[in-house]
């Protein structure tokens, strides 16, 4: 799940649904915003979800908390091998948020992960990405 800013909304609902139904299986949320102290939506709730095991992993990117900007796609690339392993094990990728830049940058990061960790050529990467979309394992709600 990749949901910076208000893009986190459906993923909070996903997690609440998992909690209500007792769903099992690993899940990973990438969340980003400008500042951790003022923009970390649902911080306490998400932290509790990690603590109780409902949310397997939470990676954050706060773009204005340091001299250089950090975004969710960079966090994905920092975890290239693990993201690739999750994909190989059947993970679904859901993206929600900004269509202008974030969605494109996340898409490019996924392609780079396929090429780097998966050793896929450009053509193989296109085929892999198309298969993810066809199998409904890569879905985007961007605006």
Tell me the role of every PLM-derived stretch:
Residues 1-17:
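Active-site beta-strand/loop microenvironment that shapes enzyme catalytic pockets
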């Amino acid at each position: 799940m990749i949901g910076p800013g208000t893009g986190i909304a459906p993923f909070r609902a996903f997690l609440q649904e998992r909690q209500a139904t007792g769903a099992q299986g690993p899940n990973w949320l990438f969340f980003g915003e400008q500042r951790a102290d003022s923009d970390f939506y649902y911080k306490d709730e998400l932290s509790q979800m990690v603590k109780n095991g409902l949310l397997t992993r939470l990676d954050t990117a706060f773009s204005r908390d340091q001299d250089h900007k950090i975004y969710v796609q960079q966090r994905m690339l920092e975890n290239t091998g693990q993201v690739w392993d999750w994909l190989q094990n059947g993970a679904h990728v859901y993206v929600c948020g900004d269509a202008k830049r974030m969605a494109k940058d996340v898409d490019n990061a996924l392609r780079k992960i396929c090429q780097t960790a998966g050793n896929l050529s450009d053509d193989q990467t296109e085929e892999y990405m198309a298969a993810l979309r066809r199998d409904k394992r890569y879905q985007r709600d961007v605006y």
